[in-house]
């Protein structure tokens, strides 16, 4: 146990100190990729939602000791940022062509080729989940599995298109104002997490608000417009045969779209985890809710944690907290069943 705790401490220290950043030149511009871990291990790539990068989308999950022991023990992590979303990014030149979702998916292929990666595990949130799903449809042989959080899969409705067209125009004229920060935070977090006049917003929301203030409006606008021009993936999803694990908060604005995606996927290869009292970013708001489903999902690929960090009754990894449905043979890769879960929110 001492050896395991030391290994987890080293992994968390590596995450806190930052990975190695690479700037990959693609046909559609340069892409920032931050790499954590041993590049000899299987690859797990991540892609964030609009206006975010890996620190504001995945830090909550990757700073959980149990998640570190599961993920960095089995994978080398490649955090891909949409163009202009990386830390210290310069404003995008107005003359540069605006990318489409197809262009962004093609960039992922170029990133994989740059690092000489074959088939990879993919993890994405909302718009990032859409980009990775599109990539999986176009390049099935390059995807081992998908972990999608509050994913998009349909073309935007007229009301959604109009809403984000207004947001895009506000970004163009005013940059990331206080009003726009509130709009994006509603996209990411539950009402409980955002607080009220009587209850302060949670620390994770406060930190996300701060990070939003560092984004360049022109870069956000380009990614937002690409997502606002997305097409329906429903038909393509029906042909996907890679194992897919989907998380969604029951207060996510994209809850119904996530349920639609689940119906489009082959039930033999997909599972849904609905997290109660949570918004879209389960990775930040309730990261512990992801641990047990991911652990059993990875077992289907022959991947395991080196040992349990804690066997106390309060630990989210203790056997008493494991859903009986996850112990079925189907959950080990033969067939994954929809479940619902709620676990403690603090790491």
UniProtKB/Swiss-Prot annotation:
It holds the Pfam family Ndr. Its main location: cytoplasm. GO terms for cellular component: cytoplasm. It is found in: Cytoplasm. SUPFAM superfamilies: alpha/beta-Hydrolases. GO terms for biological process: regulation of auxin polar transport; response to abscisic acid; response to cold; response to jasmonic acid. The keyword Translocase does not apply. InterPro entries: AB_hydrolase_fold, NDRG. Gene3D superfamilies: alpha/beta hydrolase (3.40.50.1820). It comes from the Eukaryota. Keywords: Cytoplasm, Growth regulation. Interacts with the heterodimers formed by GB1 and GG1, or GB1 and GG2. Interacts with RGS1. PANTHER family: N-MYC DOWNSTREAM REGULATED. Involved in a signaling pathway that modulates root auxin transport and auxin gradients. Acts partially by positively regulating the auxin carrier PIN2 and AUX1. Acts, together with GB1 as positive regulator of meristem initiation and branching. GB1 and NDL3 positively regulate basipetal inflorescence auxin transport and modulate MAX2 expression in shoots, which regulates organ and lateral meristem formation by the establishment and maintenance of auxin gradients. Belongs to the NDRG family. This is Protein NDL3. It comes from Arabidopsis thaliana (Mouse-ear cress). The gene is NDL3.
């Amino acid at each position: 146990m001492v050896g395991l705790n030391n290994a987890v401490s080293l992994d968390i220290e590596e995450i806190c100190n930052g990975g190695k950043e690479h700037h990959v030149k693609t046909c559609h511009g340069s892409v920032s990729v931050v790499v954590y871990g041993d590049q000899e291990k299987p690859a797990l790539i991540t892609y964030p939602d609009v206006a975010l990068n890996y620190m504001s989308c995945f830090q909550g999950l990757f700073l959980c000791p149990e998640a570190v022991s599961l993920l960095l023990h089995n994978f080398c992590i490649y955090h891909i940022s949409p163009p202009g979303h990386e830390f210290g990014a310069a404003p995008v030149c107005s003359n540069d062509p605006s990318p489409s979702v197809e262009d962004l998916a093609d960039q992922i292929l170029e990133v994989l080729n740059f690092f000489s990666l074959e088939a990879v595990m993919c993890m994405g949130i909302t718009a990032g989940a859409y980009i990775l799903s599109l990539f999986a449809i176009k390049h099935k042989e390059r995807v081992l599995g998908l972990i999608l959080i509050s994913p998009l899969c349909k073309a935007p409705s007229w009301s959604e298109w109009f809403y984000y067209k207004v947001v895009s125009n506000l970004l163009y004229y005013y940059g990331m104002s206080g009003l726009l920060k509130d709009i994006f935070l509603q996209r990411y977090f539950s009402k409980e997490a955002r607080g009220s006049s009587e209850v302060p917003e949670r620390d994770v929301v406060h930190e996300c608000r701060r990070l939003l203030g560092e984004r360049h409006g022109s870069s956000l606008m380009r990614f937002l417009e690409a997502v606002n021009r997305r097409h329906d993936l429903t038909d393509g999803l029906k042909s996907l045969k890679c194992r897919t694990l989907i998380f969604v908060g029951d207060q996510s604005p994209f809850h119904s779209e996530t349920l639609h995606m689940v119906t489009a996927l082959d039930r033999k290869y997909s599972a849904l985890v609905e997290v109660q009292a949570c918004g879209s970013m389960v990775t930040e708001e309730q990261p512990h809710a992801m641990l047990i489903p991911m652990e059993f999902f990875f077992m289907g690929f022959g991947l395991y944690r080196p040992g349990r960090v804690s066997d106390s009754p309060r630990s989210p990894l203790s056997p008493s907290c494991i859903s009986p449905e996850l112990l079925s043979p189907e959950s080990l890769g033969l067939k994954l069943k929809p479940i619902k879960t709620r676990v403690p929110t603090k790491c």
